[in-house]
């Protein structure tokens, strides 16, 4: 369902270790926003919601709300450093298009 590259795994594990408290998992979500209509979001969660889809991906516990699940199926998450900046990149084979800034999709 979800692939997480070694670079993204290392960045996520570093964030979890630096959280200062136990976390239930990494929440992946799709939210309204951006110039193409939808954008990705991530957060460390202290608890999981009763309706969360819980996925073990590359040794990480990933929490996905039911509405975001359809958009995230097949996504690959990477962590890159380039001239444009450092951060997570989502490669979604199901996205129909994106925006010029690369921050949102439809």
From Swiss-Prot:
InterPro entries: FeS_biogenesis (IPR000361), FeS_cluster_insertion (IPR016092), FeS_cluster_insertion_CS (IPR017870), HesB-like_dom_sf (IPR035903)
Cross-referenced SUPFAM superfamilies: HesB-like domain
PROSITE patterns: HESB (PS01152)
Gene3D superfamilies tied to this protein: HesB-like domain
UniProt-listed Pfam families: Fe-S_biosyn
Single GO molecular function: iron ion binding
Domain of life: Bacteria
GO biological process, one term: iron-sulfur cluster assembly
Family from the record: Belongs to the HesB/IscA family.
Protein's UniProt name: Uncharacterized protein in nifU 5'region
């Amino acid at each position: 369902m979800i692939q997480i590259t070694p670079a993204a795994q290392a960045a996520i594990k570093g964030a979890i270790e630096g959280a200062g408290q136990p976390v239930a998992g990494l929440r992946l979500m799709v939210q309204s926003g951006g110039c193409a209509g939808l954008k990705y979001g991530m957060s460390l969660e202290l608890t999981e919601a009763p309706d969360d889809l819980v996925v073990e991906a590359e040794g990480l516990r990933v929490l996905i709300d039911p509405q975001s699940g359809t958009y995230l199926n097949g996504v690959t998450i990477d962590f890159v450093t380039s001239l444009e900046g450092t951060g997570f990149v989502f490669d979604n084979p199901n996205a129909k298009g994106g925006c010029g800034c690369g921050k949102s999709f439809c």
